[in-house]
Amino acid sequence: QGWTVKAVLNNDIVGGSCGSDGHCDDTHVRVFSEGPRADLSEQARAAQRRNGGENDSPSRNLSRWLDNLAEQDPAGVDVRQIWRADRMGRGGDHIPFLEAGYPAVRFSVAVEDYEHQHQDLRVEDGVTYGDTVDEMDFPYLAKVTRLNVRALDHLAGAPMPPAPTAKAAVRTFTEISWDRVPGAASYRIWQRRTDEPYWRAMPASVVQASDKPDYSIDLAGVRGDDWLFGVSSVSAEGIESPIASAVPGGGYAPLVSE
């Protein structure tokens, strides 16, 4: 239908806080995100293998963004990032979106209760099976819902993330380039060491938007071999998009459309 999809948030399962073994955790929600994106072409996969980016898919950066957003709500639920596409040996409704090239993550409870999911209502050997309302933790569900609503509000108000590239071969500086993003009032350039899991707390630079079709900035003295780079777009109201990494396949659009 020609829609632009910024992100897909799949919530499954998010209503309980106690697991099959009786362990309870009502302070975290797990967010699953893929590493190398599912729609990489062989050419893009080869480029990523040489230049890095296996931990910088749009979905992985969406997960980082959600983690930061959750930290801004002390009374809410904390995000536990799970850096795999889904639970071991299982799948979810976000997977087809990933395969189509759309950034997608899965929200799921911190601990699973296997007796009360995908089960017919019954009692066996004294154990009650089935999805029943008495197993719900509604205050926990409310916190997960609040995080989702805040995420949707921010995603709707933010411009699309850019699609940056980084050039740093055989030079003592790094050039970051990207095309203009409609609705962006400014852009923030981010960096982190290649072995760091999270972006630095402060941007490396800020570029104000204009009417020109593309942008480029040189980071003097920054040897690109040692760093990963990203760019986020910011609306006039100050709402920031997730970061897009300047790596092969780092943009948020499906690669099949390129």
Residue ranges of each PLM-predicted region?
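Proline-enriched interdomain boundary motifs that mark the N-terminal boundary
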Residues: 158-168, 256
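Extracellular low-complexity, O-glycosylation-prone stalks/linkers
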Residues: 184-204
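Beta-strand-rich modules
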Residues: 217-240
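Metal-dependent peptidase/peptidase-like ectodomains
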Residues: 1-92, 100, 104
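Conserved aromatic anchor
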Residues: 172-184
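Active-site-adjacent mobile loop/cap segments within catalytic or ligand-binding domains
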Residues: 17-30, 82-159
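Extracellular fibronectin type III
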Residues: 234-258
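Short beta-strand segments within Ig-like beta-sandwich modules, predominantly Fibronectin type-III
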Residues: 202-212
